[in-house]
């Protein structure tokens, strides 16, 4: 599968390894159905008092996972954590942020079968659409990274001031906005 690139145009004739990998991932996922998962707030797993069952539209008797029912306090904690992290992230050079995002995209690609199987069971998409969506997610991140590099971090020189006798340097700079 090394030379096969999954796209919406190629999904109609994929190599057999794509089906085999997906089938194995579905079986592994089914073995863990019903497991409880916490929320992640400020880098820590947080459990809520209330839970809910995440069921599959493929078979509504399948409980895929027991999830946390977050409340306003959890949302406030998550927003506070994001605000706390923002200054460091916004001062991280764009090249380093691109490096982190490329690593995230690579991890998504490495876990394409696991993520695709989870999407198929949770959303009810067929295997090729779910695998295609996972690959498209990685590709979108790669594209954003490419655009950042192509545009030098989106530091773009703007037009000269047209007024006679005035000299101004106008620059457009893309920066993280915050929480």
Regions found by a protein language model. Give the residues of each.
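Conserved small-residue-rich beta-alpha loop and adjacent elements
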Residues: 154-179
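Short glycine-rich loop/turn motifs that provide flexible caps or phosphate-binding loops at active sites
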Residues: 33, 41-42, 123, 152, ...
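Hydrophobic face of amphipathic alpha-helices that form TPR/SEL1-like repeat modules
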Residues: 1-63
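Short glycine- and Lys/Arg-enriched binding-loop motifs that mark or flank ligand-binding interfaces
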Residues: 39, 149, 174
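Glycine-rich loop-to-alpha-helix module at the N-terminal edge of alpha/beta enzyme cores
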Residues: 55, 59-156
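C-terminal segments
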Residues: 1-17, 135, 139-153, 171
């Amino acid at each position: 599968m090394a030379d096969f690139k999954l796209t919406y145009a190629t999904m109609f004739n994929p190599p057999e390894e794509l089906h085999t990998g997906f089938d194995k991932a579905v079986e592994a996922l089914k073995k863990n159905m019903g497991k409880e998962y916490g929320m992640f707030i400020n880098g820590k797993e947080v459990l809520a008092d209330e839970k809910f069952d995440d069921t599959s539209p493929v078979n509504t008797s399948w409980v895929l996972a027991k999830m946390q029912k977050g409340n306003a306090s959890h949302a406030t904690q998550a927003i506070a954590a994001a605000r706390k992290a923002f200054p460091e992230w916004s001062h991280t050079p764009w090249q380093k942020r691109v490096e982190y995002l490329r690593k995230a995209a690579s991890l998504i690609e490495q876990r394409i079968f696991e993520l695709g199987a989870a999407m198929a069971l949770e959303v009810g998409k067929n295997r090729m659409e779910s695998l295609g969506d996972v690959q498209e997610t990685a590709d979108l991140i790669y594209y954003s990274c490419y655009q950042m590099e192509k545009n030098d971090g989106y530091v773009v020189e703007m037009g000269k001031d047209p007024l006679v006798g005035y000299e101004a340097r106008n620059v457009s700079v893309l920066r993280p906005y915050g929480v």
